[in-house]
Amino acid sequence: VVKLAQEMGLVKLGTVAIDGTKIKANASRHKAMSYERMQQAEGELKAQIEALLERAKSTDAAEADEPEVDIPAEIQRREDRLKAITEARQRIEQRQRDADIERGRSPDDERKPRDDEGNPKGGRYKREFGVPEPKAQDNFTDPDSRIMKRAGGGFDASYNAQTVVDEQVKIIVAAELSNNAADVGQLVPMLEAVKVNTGKAPEQALADAGYRSEDNFQALAGSGTELVVAMGREGKRCAEVDAQKTPHTAAMAAKLQTDAGKAAY
């Protein structure tokens, strides 16, 4: 559809606007479980299975008057539940390992932050490598979804839908779904998706403060697309930017003070 619109001359790719919105997943938040609760539930289910196995071995006359209990079925039900919880726990742990590696951590870092040369920077990570936070969650009906905050308040199992819209003709030129609630990691891949879909980069891209990061600005510095990204929420004063530590962010802040920057924003 995008290519057809482009062939018809409808897609201009002068200025595009990037934004994200949370879409509720087809999954109940009541079907989610925290990492801490998973660990507790695994222990409880293992104990129940062991007790049922012992009961099957030692059935006596005292149970003759009790309603018949299908012990194999009860064991199977608990084993199925245990398997589902164990798989969910392992998914959370794998996600945490992947996230830690992306942040520059390693399994043997001894919880000590290090610089690019491997030298300790001081301080200490609050948890071991790959160990999730107790409140980290996984959903049994839609494991790919994540608990995200709703715009009106509260939380749901959701996805973060990203769109890039041609500002002149209001045509969506790229759309993707992410299970990361934060927008900041989507700026580079969404602009790359525009190039994949249309064969060219937009001249200018507008985005709100959720996409602001020094890494984003640096990665897109030579992309051929002029970025105009807000420094903070409208009407709120932003902290001073250190031009020595974050030169690209400082340049963006300066651009937003110009007439051209204000007009674009």
Role assignments for model-derived ranges:
Residues V1-Y265:
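Anion-binding and metal-coordination hotspots
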